């Protein structure tokens, strides 16, 4: 497809065009050589074709079918040349391969002068369609120029076809778009769809002016509907008021006619004759009743007119304060369902207002007599509607009350939960504070202990350094210090008379540089010996207590043996003791022992009590100033032995053998217990009753 004129088309390198041009040049040269000879007529010449084919070429060469460039350059000379050559291009359109045969010579029907003129001007005006021509002069067009024109026409035809295809596609797309928009308009006009759908459709397309226009039209329609509804509402209001006034007027007219009739009847009765007194009285009563009825009706009419006037003033004031323009401007952005809901709400409010007005006007209307039955019958229908509304409102109020109670219960439950959570929170906070305080105390203790450890470690280091210095300065001091703290275990009383300077007497006189070290070593030796002495003293006290207990049990055993040998089954004699001393010793058997009645436990208790009582009696008789502390310790041990019951004999079995000082402690005992000190055997108390009193 070529996009230029005839010359660029020839320059593109088309083989067919170049071949045609070469043939035409060769033919022109041959014609110039054979100038005097007439050109031979070709059997396939387009000039010898039928004249009926000219119409088809003329139809191609018309101004409407040619491109704009061809129309601008169309001149009468070209038209004359086109008409002078009938059928010149019909075969070119039908068979493009016959171009080299179609223009081999000048047609035979042409005059000689024209042929000479064409031959003279032919080399100068070649490719006139591409190079241009001088207007007003006849131009002979060669087949190359005609070929260029045909190519241009084909190009224009192809362009027009492509334009037609493009327009068809555009038309199809526009039809699809129109159908889609029609569907969208139908969806928008559908009242079942919501406002969100309309807004999303309006927001999806940036060029949604048609949607906006449609919405505006809908808004206008809805505004008109709202105006119509307002008009109907106002008409209903005015009709209601006028009907009430009309009814009152009709009632007044009827009453007036009735009064007039009664007056005429009264006058006729007076003219006809005298009536009895009863009839006169009834007529007077009727007149009074009618007068009172007229007065009440006039009052009610006056009240109704005043009410009508006040309602008109209220309506004017409402209309002045709330203009319809602002309402319509507010309603413009509303959707159809929302407007319908608003209309329903307004109708409900209007019905409520009418019901309230009717309730307010009921006491006023109660004054007329019962002859207004027709007017009351007219108001019965809205009262039924009002009753329905009241029932519905009562049901709604009942539901709201139930919901309120349920919500109050839920609120109370939530309050309780909140209180519980707050209490738990307070408890947790207290626990957290306690934990923090404990943590702080623990940290303080740790810090104190760390400080003590640091001080002790520092002291230990100092002592170690001092010891090293002492060892370096005077190595003889440690050897004598080791010899001193090795006393014999039998020298108990000599430890009390240990001279404080005995460690220093055996040592040589200290030299001046190590005198402090010697003093420290002596102090350490004294401290060690004092600790050993205290330990031994405590051990001696415990040994004495153990010896006393052993002696008591031995004496008891000997007594039991003697008594058993004398009289089997008699109770052992019990020495009466002080109540304060023996108060912890006698214990009543437990309820379990009494319930079971086992004689073994009773015998064990009796044995322990008797042994301790005997020991206390002996201690009272043999009490001296030297053994007061020993007696107190034995009382404490006896009290602990009574609480332990059967656990005391294992304690006695675990005690070590008495020291050599044991016989000295038992020396003041009476003569009947002399045999108790001869044996060193440890007696277990619970085993005695089993041997003496087998069950």
Curated annotation (Swiss-Prot):
Compartmental location: Cell projection, Cilium membrane
Protein origin, superkingdom: Eukaryota
SMART domains: IQ (SM00015)
Keyword Chaperone tagged: no
Pfam family, one: IQ
Gene Ontology CC, one term: ciliary membrane
Residues with PTM Phosphoserine: 322
Residues covered by the IQ domain: 542-571, 601-630
UniProt keyword Plastid, yes or no: no
Region (Disordered): 29-55, 357-390, 465-521, 564-599, 618-695
Coiled coil start-end: 157-264, 292-358, 387-477
GO biological process: one example: limb morphogenesis
UniProt keywords, alphabetically: Cell membrane, Cell projection, Coiled coil, Membrane, Phosphoprotein, Repeat
Main location group: membrane
Membrane topology reported for the UniProt record: Peripheral membrane protein
InterPro entries linked to this entry: CellDiv_DevSignal_Domain, IQ_motif_EF-hand-BS
Regions of compositional bias (Basic and acidic residues) in chain numbering: 465-482
Biological role: Component of the EvC complex that positively regulates ciliary Hedgehog (Hh) signaling. Required for proper limb morphogenesis.
Assembly description: Component of the EvC complex composed of EFCAB7, IQCE, EVC2 and EVC; built from two subcomplexes, EVC2:EVC and EFCAB7:IQCE. Interacts (via N-terminus) with EFCAB7 (via EF-hands 1 and 2); this interaction anchors the EVC-EVC2 complex in a signaling microdomain at the base of cilia and stimulates the Hedgehog (Hh) pathway. Interacts with EVC2 (via N-terminal end). Interacts with EVC.
Disease linkage: Polydactyly, postaxial, A7: A form of postaxial polydactyly, a condition characterized by the occurrence of supernumerary digits in the upper and/or lower extremities. In postaxial polydactyly type A, the extra digit is well-formed and articulates with the fifth or a sixth metacarpal/metatarsal. PAPA7 is an autosomal recessive condition characterized by postaxial polydactyly restricted to the feet.
UniProt protein name: IQ domain-containing protein E
Native source species: Homo sapiens
């Amino acid at each position: 497809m070529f996009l230029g004129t005839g010359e660029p088309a020839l320059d593109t390198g088309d083989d067919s065009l170049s071949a045609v041009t070469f043939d035409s040049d060769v033919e022109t040269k041959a014609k110039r050589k054979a100038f005097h000879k007439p050109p031979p007529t070709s059997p396939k010449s387009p000039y010898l074709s039928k004249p009926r084919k000219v119409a088809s070429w003329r139809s191609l060469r018309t101004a409407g079918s040619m491109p704009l460039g061809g129309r601008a350059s169309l001149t009468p000379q070209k038209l004359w040349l086109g008409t002078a050559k009938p059928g010149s291009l019909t075969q070119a359109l039908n068979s493009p391969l016959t171009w080299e045969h179609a223009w081999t010579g000048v047609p035979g029907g042409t005059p000689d002068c024209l042929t000479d003129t064409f031959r003279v001007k032919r080399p100068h005006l070649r490719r006139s369609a591409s190079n241009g021509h001088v207007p007003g002069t006849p131009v002979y067009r060669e087949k190359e120029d005609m070929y260029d024109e045909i190519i241009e026409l084909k190009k224009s035809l192809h362009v027009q076809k492509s334009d037609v295809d493009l327009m068809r596609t555009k038309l199809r797309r526009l039809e699809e778009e129109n159908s889609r928009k029609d569907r969208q308009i139908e969806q928008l006009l559908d009242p079942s769809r919501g406002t969100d759908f309309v807004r999303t459709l309006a927001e999806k397309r940036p060029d949604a002016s048609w949607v906006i226009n449609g919405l505006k039209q809908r808004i206008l329609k809805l505004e008109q509907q709202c105006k119509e509804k307002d008009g109907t509402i106002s008409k209903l209001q005015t009709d209601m008021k006028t009907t009430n006034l009309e009814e009152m007027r009709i009632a007044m007219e009827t009453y007036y006619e009735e009064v007039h009739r009664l007056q005429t009847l009264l006058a006729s009765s007076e003219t006809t004759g005298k009536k009895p007194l009863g009839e006169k009285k009834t007529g007077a009563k009727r007149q009074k009743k009618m007068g009172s009825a007229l007065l009440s009706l006039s009052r009610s009419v006056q009240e109704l007119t005043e009410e009508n006037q006040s309602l008109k003033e209220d309506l004017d004031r409402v209309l002045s304060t709330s203009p319809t323009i602002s309402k319509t401007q507010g309603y413009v952005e509303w959707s159809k369902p929302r407007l319908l809901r608003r209309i329903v709400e307004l109708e409900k409010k209007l019905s409520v207002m009418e019901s309230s007005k009717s309730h307010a006007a009921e006491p006023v209307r109660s004054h007329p007599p019962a002859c207004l039955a027709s007017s009351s019958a007219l108001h019965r229908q809205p009262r039924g509607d009002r009753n329905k509304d009241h029932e519905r409102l009562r049901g709604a109020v009942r539901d709201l009350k139930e919901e309120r109670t349920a919500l109050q219960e839920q609120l109370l439950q939530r309050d309780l939960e909140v209180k519980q959570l707050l209490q738990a929170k307070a408890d947790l906070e207290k626990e957290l504070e306690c934990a923090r305080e404990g943590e702080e105390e623990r940290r303080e203790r740790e810090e104190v202990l760390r400080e003590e450890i640091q001080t002790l470690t520092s002291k230990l280091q100092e002592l170690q350094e001092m010891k090293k210095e002492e060892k370096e300065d005077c190595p003889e001091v440690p050897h004598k210090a080791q010899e001193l703290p090795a006393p014999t275990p039998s020298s108990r009383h000599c430890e009390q008379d240990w001279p404080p300077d005995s460690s220093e007497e055996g040592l040589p006189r200290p030299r001046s540089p190590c005198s402090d070290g010697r003093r420290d070593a002596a102090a350490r030796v004294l401290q060690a010996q004092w600790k050993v002495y205290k330990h031994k003293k405590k051990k001696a006290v415990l040994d004495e207590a153990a010896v006393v207990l052993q002696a008591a049990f031995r004496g008891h055993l000997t007594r039991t043996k003697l008594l058993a040998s004398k009289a089997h089954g008699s109770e052992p004699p019990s020495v009466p003791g002080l109540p304060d001393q023996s108060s912890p010793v006698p214990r009543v058997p437990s309820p379990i022992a009494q319930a079971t009645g086992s004689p073994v436990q009773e015998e064990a208790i009796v044995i322990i009590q008797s042994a301790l009582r005997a020991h206390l009696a002996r201690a009272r008789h043999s009490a001296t100033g030297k053994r007061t502390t020993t007696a107190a310790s034995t009382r404490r041990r006896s009290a602990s032995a009574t609480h332990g019951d059967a656990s005391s004999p294992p304690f006695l079995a675990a005690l070590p053998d008495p020291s050599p000082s044991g016989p000295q402690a038992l020396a003041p005992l009476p003569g009947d217990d002399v045999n108790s000190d001869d044996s060193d055997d440890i007696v277990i108390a619970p085993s005695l009753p089993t041997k003496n009193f087998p069950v």
